[in-house]
Curated annotation (Swiss-Prot):
May interact with CcsA. GO terms for cellular component: plasma membrane-derived thylakoid membrane. Required during biogenesis of c-type cytochromes (cytochrome c6 and cytochrome f) at the step of heme attachment. Its main location: membrane. This is Cytochrome c biogenesis protein CcsB. One of its GO terms (biological process) is cytochrome complex assembly. The lineage of its organism: Bacteria, Bacillati, Cyanobacteriota, Cyanophyceae, Synechococcales. Keywords: Cytochrome c-type biogenesis, Membrane, Thylakoid, Transmembrane, Transmembrane helix. It is a multi-pass membrane protein. Coiled coil: none annotated. The keyword Thylakoid applies.
Length: 435
């Protein structure tokens, strides 16, 4: 039992909770620095050649679960440990403190008041009248008053004691929501070309929703830089009516617990005409070795596949640059423009099809996270309310029956200086009533 009590005391220690918060904050910051939820080959290729911090290679990063920090065993264990520490701290400290505040403390002797942080005494010709005046004045100022024959107790701001308990409750809900989202949430990134659909299945394999990209538009400034991109989506739930929604950067779509973000854009295909051939739609792929946002394809110019040329572009507006095998520029083609002779063949670009980069997230813990955050804010605001307590006791044994001393004392959990300034004003009101 002593060992169990020591363990209980350790787990409910506020210093431990603060340490766990710092560790979780550090791990969360680490997750923003390191790439998360990528293919294992990416970590092996990137960090085996250049170890992180000079000592953690790709294999060690995968073993330490640094590729998926927010759903790793050690991160979720930290969340569970912090949640347990907050629950035990609330049970051991905050709940008893709240119960103690709701109970009236009945001080009967003046010497008990003299030990309080604030204590004053005044001589009254009519002690009962002075107590009545003090009681009325306190009630006018919003104090709760408990009046007895020769004494009174008053308190104000008791709701402030609820604040710390609400903060702990909100943090626990936030942690539960974060853990639930990490364990049960889903994340999917896809590029869709206009007219293409994405079928979303439930865990049983049944079609839950069909998502079709009807239109995709990229807005650019006069210099050609991307300013905004928008997708018009059609949602087809099984057995339900279709809905059309538009999303853009910073304006996602929320639908039945799922959130669809406009995350990126790409180029999907190019439509070309070679000589008198029909228009051919050919897929594009990215060429990171040529630049950050460069797409293209290798196109043979002879029936036997020889003498290929590289067609590359960085925008759906063009131009499309055509390079020979030795890297020399053969020409620039504009989408929708006239054909240009390339190696003896007329080559025309009809259009370039952009693709919308969609990020789909389903996080069942989000409502709990929001609720926990709101409760934490509410508790933090209530915690700022000072809880004040005041007692007044008439001297039980006056030397002269007509003159009795009224002893007044008070406590405050914060802003004691404010109560110290308020106490003389209360005493002055009592003095005025005697005159």
């Amino acid at each position: 039992m002593p060992a169990l009590r020591r363990l209980f005391a350790l787990l409910s220690d506020l210093r431990l909770a603060i340490l766990l918060l710092l560790l979780i904050a550090g791990a969360s910051a680490l997750g923003t620095i390191l790439p998360q939820n990528e293919a294992p080959d990416l970590y092996l290729e990137r960090f085996n050649a250049d170890p992180w911090l000079g000592m953690i290679n790709g294999e060690q990063m995968l073993q330490l679960q640094l590729d998926s920090i927010y759903s790793s065993v050690w991160f979720l264990s930290l969340l569970a440990w912090l949640g347990l520490a907050l629950i035990l701290c609330s049970w051991r400290r905050q709940w008893p403190a709240l119960l103690a505040t709701t109970r009236w403390i009945d001080y009967r002797q003046p010497r008990q008041l003299s030990k309080l942080a604030l204590a004053e005494s005044i001589l009254c010709s009519n002690g009962e009248s002075a107590l009545d005046t003090l009681s009325e004045e306190l009630q006018k100022q919003g104090w709760q008053v408990q009046r007895n024959e020769d004494r009174l107790a008053a308190r104000r701001g008791v709701i402030g004691k609820v604040g710390p308990l609400l903060v702990h409750t909100g943090l626990v809900l936030l942690l539960i929501g974060a853990a639930w989202g990490a364990l049960s949430g889903n994340r999917l990134e896809r590029f869709l070309a206009p007219g293409r659909a994405l079928d979303l299945l439930d865990p049983s394999g049944n079609n839950r929703l069909s998502l079709t990209l009807e239109r995709f538009a990229i807005e650019r400034d006069p210099a050609g830089r991307t300013e905004q991109f928008r997708s018009t989506l059609r949602l087809d739930p099984p057995g339900g009516p279709s809905e059309q929604r538009m999303i853009s950067v910073n304006h996602p779509l929320r639908y039945r617990g799922m959130t669809v973000y406009q995350a990126d854009w790409s180029l999907a295909a190019i439509t070309v005409q070679i000589g008198k051939s029909p228009e051919l739609q050919l897929p594009l792929r990215s060429f990171p070795e040529l630049g950050e946002q460069i797409w293209g394809l290798v196109l043979p110019t002879r029936p036997d596949g020889s003498e290929p040329v590289l067609m590359s572009t960085s925008s759906e507006q063009g131009p499309v640059q055509v390079f020979d095998a030795d890297g020399s520029l053969l020409g620039n083609l504009r989408p929708g423009g006239a054909s240009t002779e390339i190696k003896g063949l007329p080559l025309r670009v009809a259009n370039i099809m952009p693709a919308s980069g969609l990020l789909l997230k389903r996080d069942p813990g989000v409502p709990l996270v929001y609720a926990g955050f709101a409760i934490t804010l509410l508790g933090g605001g209530l915690s700022l309310i000072a809880t004040r307590q005041l007692w007044a006791v008439l001297d039980p044994a006056p030397f002269q029956p007509s003159n009795r001393k009224l002893h007044i004392g008070g406590l405050c959990n914060r802003n004691l200086a404010g109560l110290a300034a308020e106490l003389p004003r209360l005493i002055s009101r009592v003095d005025e009533s005697r005159d």
